[in-house]
């Protein structure tokens, strides 16, 4: 049975831990609001960009750009896995890594070649355990205080270069789509060959200089926009998951403090009772 001193030290230690988790929860809540606003603001632009590209793509025939039609092969798959740079965010990283592992295993079973590009240290650490030979690169965002379109452009340049060089036939990004503080949806989205959903409209458009020229210019931007949207969704999901995880940790610390305090009071009461009995017994002996 632990001594009163041990119990008191443990209560103090858990209280200090609770202060830390509470502070982290508050920081995550502040960051979540900014990240959520950025993700929600980017969605309409990405949807409109996709609708325009889909409208242009619908009129393309055999001469469609390679980014849209593909290169005629389906052998080399590049998986871009987006996770966080830091931990303490519950199952945020493990869920997306699990989805990427599942897809990679399915592709290997089909005889495909899998390559992996990670964004975020935590995904790199987990995937390198059993997919080290498939790694082709890593994007470090640890020094980025606020995600910008330039971050997405850098990743887009890498995957576009791999596609143009024949080093990747299909590119799929893996990220957590933000729904709420307690709900982040692991998502796999193919970006090359490009897939965009057409908007439901009866409007007819005239394009200048030509549909082909505009499409050739928009497709690389569309890939970068999809990656940027995924980065923002992932960032909001990370802060939501961290806020939820730290809230749970704070609650658990409070429960543990209550239990330890009860145990401390009972032990202290037992010690006092024992001392009283010894005093009374000594007095009776006299």
Curated annotation (Swiss-Prot):
- Keyword terms: ATP synthesis, Cell inner membrane, Cell membrane, CF(1), Hydrogen ion transport, Ion transport, Membrane, Transport
Listed InterPro entries: ATP_synth_F1_ATPase_gsu (IPR035968), ATP_synth_F1_gsu (IPR000131), ATP_synth_F1_gsu_CS (IPR023632)
Instruction: Return one GO MF term.
Output: proton-transporting ATP synthase activity, rotational mechanism
> Which family does this protein fall into?
Belongs to the ATPase gamma chain family.
**Alphabetical list of PANTHER family matching this protein:** ATP SYNTHASE GAMMA CHAIN (PTHR11693), ATP SYNTHASE SUBUNIT GAMMA, MITOCHONDRIAL (PTHR11693:SF22)
Instruction: State how it assembles.
Output: F-type ATPases have 2 components, CF(1) - the catalytic core - and CF(0) - the membrane proton channel. CF(1) has five subunits: alpha(3), beta(3), gamma(1), delta(1), epsilon(1). CF(0) has three main subunits: a, b and c.
Tell me the NCBIfam families matching this sequence: ATPsyn_F1gamma, PRK05621.1-4
Name of protein: ATP synthase gamma chain
Species source reads Fuscovulum blasticum (Rhodobacter blasticus)
Q: What is the lineage of its organism?
A: Bacteria, Pseudomonadati, Pseudomonadota, Alphaproteobacteria, Rhodobacterales
């Amino acid at each position: 049975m632990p001594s009163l001193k041990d119990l008191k030290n443990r209560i103090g230690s858990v209280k200090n831990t609770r202060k830390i988790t509470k502070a982290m929860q508050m920081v995550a809540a502040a960051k979540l609001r900014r990240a959520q606003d950025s993700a929600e603001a980017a969605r309409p632009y990405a949807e409109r960009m996709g609708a325009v590209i889909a409208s242009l793509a619908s009129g393309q025939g055999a001469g469609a750009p390679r980014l849209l039609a593909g290169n005629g092969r389906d052998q080399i798959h590049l998986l871009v896995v987006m996770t966080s740079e830091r931990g303490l965010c519950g199952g945020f990283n493990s869920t997306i890594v699990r989805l990427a592992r599942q897809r990679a295993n399915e592709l290997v079973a089909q005889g495909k070649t899998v390559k992996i590009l990670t964004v975020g240290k935590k995904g790199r650490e987990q995937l390198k355990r059993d997919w080290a030979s498939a790694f082709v690169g890593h994007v470090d965002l640890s020094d980025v205080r606020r995600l910008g379109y330039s971050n997405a452009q850098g990743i887009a340049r890498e995957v576009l270069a791999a596609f143009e060089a024949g080093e990747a036939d299909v590119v799929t990004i893996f990220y957590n789509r933000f729904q709420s503080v307690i709900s982040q949806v692991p998502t796999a989205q193919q970006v090359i060959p490009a897939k965009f959903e057409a908007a439901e409209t009866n409007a007819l458009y005239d394009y200048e200089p030509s549909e082909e020229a505009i499409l050739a210019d928009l497709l690389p931007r569309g890939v970068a926009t999809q990656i940027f949207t995924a980065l923002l969704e992932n960032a909001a999901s990370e802060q939501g998951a961290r806020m939820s995880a730290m809230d749970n940790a704070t609650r658990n610390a409070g429960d543990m403090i209550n239990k330890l305090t009860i145990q401390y009071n009972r032990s202290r009461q037992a010690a006092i009772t024992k001392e009283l009995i010894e005093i009374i017994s000594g007095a009776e002996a006299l």
